[in-house]
């Protein structure tokens, strides 16, 4: 297994799909990384040489991925909550942030129904 950005990349998958196992790398970014590295999309990771894997590592290192990306996202949410803006309040209360209705639906964000106690 090749190790890129601290993640074990599956050997038996095509390079385009295998790179998506890195947090922050989807199909589009994966294709861009492979094009920049000069590697075909349909080749399997196990067929790549060490030099090609090193170029992949260098290309992935140019992007914010994995722990840095997670930290960046959580810090931006924390910043909104500290500001006390509308989006921050919605995050703090665990409600939908982007204007969805909450009278019905929004169960995923609000959690399970709480029974009414008499």
From Swiss-Prot:
The keyword tRNA-binding applies. Gene3D superfamilies: 1.10.8.50, 30s ribosomal protein s13, domain 2. NCBIfam families: uS13_bact. HAMAP family: Ribosomal_uS13. Part of the 30S ribosomal subunit. Forms a loose heterodimer with protein S19. Forms two bridges to the 50S subunit in the 70S ribosome. PROSITE patterns: RIBOSOMAL_S13_1, RIBOSOMAL_S13_2. GO terms for molecular function: rRNA binding; structural constituent of ribosome; tRNA binding. Keywords: Ribonucleoprotein, Ribosomal protein, RNA-binding, rRNA-binding, tRNA-binding. One of its GO terms (cellular component) is small ribosomal subunit. Residues 94-118 are annotated as: Disordered. It comes from Salmonella typhi. This is Small ribosomal subunit protein uS13. The gene is rpsM. The lineage of its organism: Bacteria, Pseudomonadati, Pseudomonadota, Gammaproteobacteria, Enterobacterales. Located at the top of the head of the 30S subunit, it contacts several helices of the 16S rRNA. In the 70S ribosome it contacts the 23S rRNA (bridge B1a) and protein L5 of the 50S subunit (bridge B1b), connecting the 2 subunits; these bridges are implicated in subunit movement. Contacts the tRNAs in the A and P-sites.
């Amino acid at each position: 297994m090749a190790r890129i950005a601290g993640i074990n990349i599956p050997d038996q998958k095509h390079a385009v799909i295998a790179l998506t196992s890195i947090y922050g790398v989807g199909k589009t970014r994966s294709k861009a990384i492979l094009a920049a590295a000069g590697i075909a999309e349909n080749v399997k990771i196990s067929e790549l040489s060490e030099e090609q894997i090193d170029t992949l590592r260098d290309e992935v290192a140019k992007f914010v991925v994995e722990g840095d990306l997670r930290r960046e996202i959580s810090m931006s949410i924390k910043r909104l909550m500290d500001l006390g803006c509308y989006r921050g309040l919605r995050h703090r209360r665990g409600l939908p942030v982007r204007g969805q209705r909450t009278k019905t639906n929004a169960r995923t964000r609000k959690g399970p129904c709480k029974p009414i106690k008499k």
